Amino acid sequence: DVYKRQVVNWAPVIREGMHVDPLTIMSKAVLEGTGHDCEIARVVARKNDIKLNTPTGGVIGERSLNVELGESTTVENTKEIYPGLFVSGMAANGVSGSFRMGPIFGGMLMSGKKAAELICAKLDK
């Protein structure tokens, strides 16, 4: 079966301490939006020994708080970091080694909009 437009929320599994075997999901595009920890990008890079579209080829990690730069770089760092893997929001800054916090004045919304546009453009090809 093919299911379209799905979101997987793992939070209840973690919260309840449930043991769940790994889920296998096939997708043309994945949006990494796990926030500061950028968990999806970290796991994908580590387990597959791949290079990400970052200056170091890996997850760089966040820098200290800078409201002004954090706001703008959140949108700038929203991109495809590996074929089919897109990053947005604070995960975008974490992956790219930019500043934490700050994007509270629209940067998060603009990052999400940019991610959606990038994904739609890729899927339309």
Regions found by a protein language model. Name each.
Residues 79-99:
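Short FAD-binding loop at a beta-strand-to-alpha-helix junction that anchors the flavin cofactor
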Residues 56-79:
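Glycine-rich phosphate/nucleotide-binding loop
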Residues 17-18, 22-25, 74-81:
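Solvent-exposed alpha-helices and their adjacent loops that cap or buttress functional pockets
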Residues 24-35:
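Short hydrophobic core segments
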Residues 10-12, 35-36:
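Short glycine-/small-residue-rich Rossmann-like dinucleotide-binding loops
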Residues 95-123:
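A conserved FAD-binding loop/helix module that cradles the flavin
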Residues 2-3:
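Short, small-residue-biased leader/transition segments that mark boundaries at the very start
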Residues 20, 36-62:
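Glycine-rich beta-alpha-beta "Rossmann" dinucleotide-binding loop(s) and their flanking helix/strand
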